[in-house]
Every structure is written in structure tokens, then in C-alpha cells.
């Protein structure tokens, strides 16, 4: 070590390593100190770069120099432990005094060669050829036999033995083999201790009470540990000193064919992972087996352990009670109650359902919406769902709950489409419209306002009651190739107004087929489970009016002949939803003055051609029929059917409601009043001009 650095450099290195200078030569301590101070001097960690560079230079020089010295000398201790008074004699490791002068003659001259080279030549000449040990060992152990007197020295070898020794000396490989063979014949190998059988798992009779999850982060408060009796006693005492706060602990002995073991049953105050409890046990069990699992049925397990073949050894409490194993169940929101509400209120919008149910969390006695009674879905259900809504307000899965409820509504609707006929579906829609009208359509002025919408439609179409009944018949029966309705006319002729009213009446959906062909499939997917659909403002390639812009709606429609016919099932798809094969619903289509190809026109059973009428537009401008969306409502269509058609024209299921509403209309609206409303519309006046004022006076 002294050859590696100078004295000043050694002191400087030890100061940089921040250890005492007396530790010079202790390589293990120096290496450990080097790792520690490297973190202090490293520039990336805010240290001194100059000190770090100097430390690396000195420490690297020490390591390189030591490697060179070891490679030259062959042994790091040969120089320091050489003694002039000993040499290797004729037999191996034999002590023999030696003439100092003879040895000194062999010592190298400082000016010639190196010490390491001379030492290797000296060792090879003096000892390597004589490195042979002939010995015999007794097969009996030294501990078993008493000490005997020292045997006499062996006699001098005979000439034959000397020749044999010389032969062995010349062939060291055979020497190694003979000595090895002698050791195996004289000293047999030690017998391995027979390992005790360790159980692979808990007793089979306890499987039903334990959790068999392999990788689980779930926390539990009941655990069962299976180990030896000694370790069970140790764990029973040391578990109190750990971070696991134990409320109840008991140990049970168990013996089977494989041996005897002990079961330690723990119930903790807090919840822990199985891995945490097992890690605590493994840290104290080096050789003993250990098994640890969570308990899913604590009370049943305790009762089973209290019976043979198990035996109670000790427990910190005299028995346990039922309530100690039961957790207080937190009251959670009732998902099914929300689903039932969505079905009864027929809500198929997730966000709408979410908003309605959040409003239910308000105290019913302080709710302004219940006092106004504007929406039936609110004031009829608020009180019954208030408690569940308070829990729903704290839930983190509000949207998931509402999505599940909406899915049930859509599933029930699809089931009705499969089980019910279209007439039965229409009857159900009639009853739904009647119930909704009961909520808002009451009072003479309100009824007169809605009857003004009925009168407007009678002026728009000649024999409108027959036309409406015909449309109703075509859409309901949905006969193949005789079920679609086309409403065509110039701008501002009332096409979309009439079509939108029928869409609300049938509870259908509007589709846009003027989109590019690659997006058309997803647009048509909106027709899944619909009673009918509206294709509004379809554009064509050839225009009959120079002010119209061409479009590709008619071209797309020409590629949907199977959809329009309704003869075979077509595949409809939505995003993130599998394709569904069904008959495409009947179509009500509106379009301006475009040329319609015969291949499309023949697939419409009814063609309505509307013409713009100035007095209809003037009448609407002077009334609130458009602002209140009366003309766009299906209630107006239903009121027109009630006003003009007899009771017998309706199905028996809805006749009771029809009679009730016909009586209501006759009570508030006379035939004379209705004629005056029609005349006001023809004159371009407010439909209720001179009627509502007289009634109010």
C-alpha cells in the first residue's frame, strides 16, 4: 500500500475521504467512504467539482497501482511474510533450520530483476516439487474415540517406497487423485437431515371460511395464520408490539397425518392487506412454514376451530359475540328505485334523469317546483324519492346509475316493439298524450288557443281530418311499399311545420340524409327502435327553382330503396353499438321543388303538395301559435282528430279518454267559435281576435 501514493498524497486522500489517517490500507473502509463522499463532492448534487476530480485521481491511482503489484508478485502477502529462518525441506512443510549465508547467496541483487520474479523462482524450486502429503485418516470420529498415545514415528521408507515416492513426485496429477480417493474411502459423507413434512396449505375443512384470492389489494380485519406451535406462541406475543392493532386473538392446535401445527386467529381493529400481515409473520419465521389468509366468515370459522380436531390453547377474550364480526353496513343509494322511476316517467335521457333526481334531494315542503306543479314527473315522485335522492347526491357513481336506468327504459321499449303490434303501440302513445294534456291543457283560454292551431291546419289542407287519418293509417299499418308519406312544396308552405307535428305525435326522430355517404350509416342508426322517422328538407341534384341549392339527399335516398320499401330487414348501426337488423320504420319526407326520380317517388304511398298562402303567414305573425310551438306539437294533431272524428273511429282502449276530451272541447269551444277562428285566419288576423276578449268581458 505504501508504494501506491506518497505520504502527502495519502494524507490528502484520507482527508478527502473524511476518515482517520490511521485507516490507510483498510480498503473496505476506504471504498465505503469513497461512495459516501462522492455524493457530497459530485457537481450534479451541488458539490465541489475540484475536490471530486482530485478524489477520483488519487483513488484511481491507488486501485491501478495495487492491481499492478498483485499481478507482478502473484501473492499480496508473500513479500511481507517471508522469513529467512524457514525453507521447504525434503518433505512438505517440514521445519528445517537453514544456513543464513546459503540463503543470502540466493537473494537477488537490488539492481537485478524484481523481487516478485525471484520469489516465484525460489518457491517453485524449493517447494512445488515436494508438495505432497501422505496421510491416513481413521473412519471413526475424534469425538467418539478417547485420545490415545502418540504413535511411534514411521520407519524409514524402503527403496521400493522411495521409488514409489519419486514416481508420485514426478506426476502430481496422480498424487491428487490418490489423496482424493483416500479421503473418500476413509471419511464417509455426512448424512443429510431428513426434512420434516410441511403442509402446503390450510386444512381442507377450513377452505370455505377463507379467502383464496392470490393477488388482491382488498383490506380485511380478520386473518388466520397457520404455522408451528413454537412460532405460533411467539407470534401470539409479538403481534401486540407490531403496527397491527389486535382486538381479538386466539390460538388453536391442530394435528393430522403430516404433523402438528397451530392456527392463530386474529381480528384487528383496522383493516390490513393480507400481504402486510404475512410479511410481519415471515420476518419472524426463518425455517418454519407459514401460511396466512384473510377470513371471510369469522364467526363460522371460530365455531369450527372450537370443535375437534382443533383445540383451543389461549385467547385474549373469553369467547366472541356475533356483533364483533359484523360490520356496520353503510346505507347506499337504491339503484333499482331510480330505474323504476325512469321507467314510470319514461325518461330516456341520462342528463335529464340526473338533473331530475338531484332536485329530489330538496326538502319536499320547501320545493317551489312542487308548489307550481309544472311537471308531472317532479311533483308526483318528489316525496317518495327524497330519501334515496339524498343518498344519490353523495354517490360517486351518479352518471353510471342514471345510465343503467336509461338502459332499462330503452330495453323495455325494445321489448314492447317485439311483443306488441303497431296498433297497440299507437294506443299506448294516445294514452300518454292524453295524460300529458291533463297536466297543462285546462281552462277556456288555453283550450281556445290550442283549437286555433287546429283551425290553422284545417285552412292549410282541404279535408285535413281525412288527410291526417290517412297518414295515421299508413304509418300504423306500415304495409310494405305503401307506407311512406311525401310532403312537397315551395319555401314557407308549411311542410316542416306539419311534419314536425306528426313526429311529436308518433314520438319519432328526424334524420339528415343530406350528409356525405360515409356518414350516412350512423345517421340511419338513429332509426333503431323508432315508430317512424322524418327525412326533413331532402335536397336533390336537379332543381325546379333556380333559387334552390343542389344536394345529394335524393342520391343517397336512391341507394336506400330497401329501407324505404320495408320488405326486408336492414342493418342499422350506431357508434359503440353492435349492428341491429330490423325493418326500417315508415318515413315522412319533406322536400322543396326538386326533381324526384320515379324510383323514389313510387315508394311513397301519399304525396301532399302544399302551396304558400299569404293569409296563413299573416295570421301567424299576429298570434303566438309559433312562439308557443302549438303548430309543431302532436297535441294539435290529436285535438284535430278528436274534433272531427266520431268516437267509434278510435280503438276501444282509448275511447274512454276520447269521450272525456270531446266533452271538454264541446264545453269550452262551440262550433260558432271555431268557425270564427277559421274566419280570422282567412282574414289574416289573430285567430282569437274578438273571441278571447268577449269571453273575458
Curated annotation (Swiss-Prot):
Ranges where the record places region Disordered: 136-198
Catalytic activity: Couples ATP hydrolysis with the unwinding of duplex DNA by translocating in the 3'-5' direction; ATP + H2O = ADP + phosphate + H(+)
Zinc finger (T-ag D1-type): 330-422
A Pfam family reported for this protein in Swiss-Prot or TrEMBL: T_Ag_DNA_bind
Cofactor annotation: Mg(2+)
Chain positions with Phosphothreonine modification: 187
UniProt modified residues of type N-acetylmethionine: 1
Gene Ontology CC: one annotated term: host cell nucleus
Tagged with keyword Ion transport: no
Pro residues composition-biased segments: 148-158
EC number: 5.6.2.4
Subcellular location(s) of the protein: Host nucleus
Region (Binding to host RB1 protein and transforming activity) residue spans: 131-135
DNA-binding region: 203-323
Described function: Isoform large T antigen is a key early protein essential for both driving viral replication and inducing cellular transformation. Plays a role in viral genome replication by driving entry of quiescent cells into the cell cycle and by autoregulating the synthesis of viral early mRNA. Displays highly oncogenic activities by corrupting the host cellular checkpoint mechanisms that guard cell division and the transcription, replication, and repair of DNA. Participates in the modulation of cellular gene expression preceeding viral DNA replication.
Free-text comment on this protein's domains from its UniProt entry: The J domain is essential for multiple viral activities, including virion assembly, viral DNA replication, transformation and transcriptional activation.
Subunit structure of this chain's protein: Forms homohexamers in the presence of ATP. Interacts with host HDAC1. Interacts (via LXCXE domain) with host RB1; the interaction induces the aberrant dissociation of RB1-E2F1 complex thereby disrupting RB1's activity. Interacts (via LXCXE domain) with host pRB-related proteins RBL1 and RBL2. Interacts (via C-terminus) with host TOP1 and POLA1 allowing DNA replication. Interacts with host TP53, inhibiting TP53 binding to DNA. Interacts with host preinitiation complex components TBP, TFIIA and TFIID to regulate transcription initiation.
Name assigned to this protein: Large T antigen
Species for this entry: B-lymphotropic polyomavirus (LPV)
Amino acid at each position: 500500500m505504501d508504494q501506491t501514493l506518497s505520504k502527502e498524497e495519502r494524507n490528502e486522500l484520507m482527508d478527502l475521504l473524511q476518515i482517520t489517517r490511521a485507516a490507510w490500507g483498510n480498503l473496505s473502509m476506504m471504498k465505503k467512504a469513497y461512495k459516501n463522499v462522492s455524493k457530497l463532492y459530485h457537481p450534479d448534487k451541488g458539490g465541489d467539482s475540484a475536490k471530486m476530480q482530485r478524489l477520483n485521481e488519487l483513488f484511481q491511482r491507488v486501485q491501478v497501482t495495487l492491481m499492478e503489484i498483485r499481478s507482478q508478485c502473484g501473492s499480496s502477502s508473500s513479500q511481507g511474510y517471508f522469513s529467512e529462518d524457514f525453507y521447504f525441506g525434503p518433505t512438505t512443510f517440514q521445519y528445517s533450520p537453514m544456513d543464513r549465508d546459503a540463503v543470502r547467496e540466493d537473494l537477488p541483487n537490488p539492481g537485478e530483476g524484481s523481487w516478485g520474479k525471484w520469489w516465484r523462482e525460489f518457491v517453485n524450486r524449493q517447494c512445488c516439487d515436494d508438495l505432497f502429503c501422505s496421510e491416513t485418516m481413521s473412519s471413526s470420529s475424534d469425538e467418539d474415540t478417547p485420545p490415545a498415545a502418540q504413535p511411534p514415528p514411521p520407519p524409514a521408507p524402503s527403496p521400493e517406497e522411495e521409488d514409489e515416492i519419486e514416481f508420485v513426485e514426478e506426476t502430481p496429477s496422480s498424487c491428487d487423485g490418490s489423496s482424493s480417493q483416500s479421503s473418500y474411502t476413509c471419511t464417509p459423507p455426512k448424512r443429510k437431515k431428513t426434512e420434516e413434512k410441511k403442509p402446503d396449505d390450510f386444512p381442507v375443512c377450513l377452505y370455505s371460511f377463507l379467502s383464496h384470492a392470490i393477488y388482491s389489494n382488498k383490506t380485511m380485519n380478520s386473518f388466520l395464520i397457520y404455522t408451528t406451535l413454537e412460532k405460533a406462541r411467539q407470534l401470539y406475543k409479538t403481534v401486540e408490539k407490531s403496527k397491527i392493532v389486535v382486538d381479538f386473538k386466539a390460538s388453536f392446535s391442530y394435528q393430522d397425518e403430516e404433523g402438528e401445527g397451530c392456527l392463530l386467529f386474529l381480528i384487528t381493529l383496522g383493516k390490513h392487506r393480507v400481504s402486510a400481515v404475512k410479511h410481519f409473520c415471515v420476518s419472524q419465521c426463518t425455517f418454519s412454514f407459514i401460511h396466512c389468509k384473510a377470513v371471510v366468515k369469522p364467526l363460522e370459522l371460530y365455531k369450527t376451530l372450537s370443535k375437534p380436531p382443533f383445540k383451543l390453547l389461549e385467547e385474549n377474550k373469553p369467547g366472541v359475540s356475533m356483533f364483533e364480526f359484523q360490520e356496520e353496513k353503510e346505507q347506499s343509494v337504491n339503484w333499482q328505485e331510480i330505474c323504476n322511476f325512469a321507467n314510470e316517467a319514461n325518461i330516456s335521457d341520462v342528463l335529464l334523469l340526473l338533473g331530475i333526481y338531484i332536485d329530489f334531494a330538496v326538502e319536499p315542503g320547501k320545493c317551489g317546483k312542487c308548489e307550481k306543479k309544472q311537471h308531472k314527473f317532479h311533483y308526483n315522485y318528489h316525496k317518495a324519492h327524497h330519501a334515496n335522492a339524498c343518498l344519490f347526491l353523495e354517490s360517486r357513481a351518479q352518471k353510471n346509475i342514471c345510465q343503467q336506468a336509461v338502459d332499462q327504459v330503452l330495453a323495455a321499449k325494445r321489448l314492447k316493439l317485439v311483443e306488441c303490434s303497431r296498433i297497440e303501440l299507437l294506443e299506448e302513445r294516445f294514452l300518454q298524450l292524453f295524460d300529458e294534456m291533463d297536466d297543462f291543457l285546462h281552462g277556456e283560454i288555453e283550450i281556445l288557443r290550442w283549437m286555433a292551431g287546429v283551425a290553422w291546419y284545417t285552412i292549410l289542407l282541404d279535408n285535413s281530418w281525412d288527410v291526417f287519418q290517412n297518414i295515421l293509417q299508413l304509418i300504423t299499418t306500415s304495409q310494405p311499399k305503401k307506407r311512406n308519406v311525401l310532403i312537397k312544396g315551395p319555401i314557407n308552405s308549411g311542410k316542416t311545420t306539419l311534419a314536425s307535428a306528426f313526429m311529436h305525435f308518433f314520438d319519432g326522430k328526424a334524420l339528415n340524409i343530406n350528409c356525405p355517404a360515409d356518414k350516412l350509416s350512423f345517421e340511419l342508426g338513429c332509426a333503431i327502435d323508432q315508430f317512424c322517422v322524418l327525412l326533413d328538407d331532402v335536397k336533390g341534384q336537379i332543381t325546379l327553382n333556380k333559387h334552390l341549392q343542389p344536394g345529394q339527399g335524393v342520391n343517397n335516398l336512391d341507394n336506400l330503396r330497401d329501407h324505404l320499401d320495408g320488405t326486408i330487414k336492414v342493418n342499422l348501426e350506431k357508434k359503440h353499438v353492435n349492428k341491429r337488423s330490423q325493418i326500417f320504420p315508415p318515413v315522412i319526407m319533406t322536400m322543396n321543388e326538386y326533381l324526384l326520380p320515379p324510383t323514389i317517388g313510387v315508394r311513397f304511398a301519399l304525396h301532399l303538395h302544399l302551396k304558400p298562402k299569404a293569409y296563413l303567414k299573416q295570421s301567424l305573425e299576429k298570434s303566438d301559435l309559433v312562439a308557443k310551438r302549438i303548430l309543431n306539437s302532436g297535441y294539435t294533431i290529436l285535438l284535430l282528430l278528436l274534433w272531427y272524428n266520431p268516437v267509434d273511429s278510435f280503438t276501444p282502449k282509448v275511447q274512454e279518454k276520447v269521450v272525456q276530451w270531446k266533452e271538454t272541447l264541446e264545453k269550452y269551444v262551440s262550433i260558432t267559435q271555431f268557425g270564427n277562428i277559421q274566419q280570422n285566419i282567412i282574414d289574416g288576423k289573430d285567430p282569437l281576435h274578438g273571441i278571447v276578449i268577449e269571453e273575458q268581458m
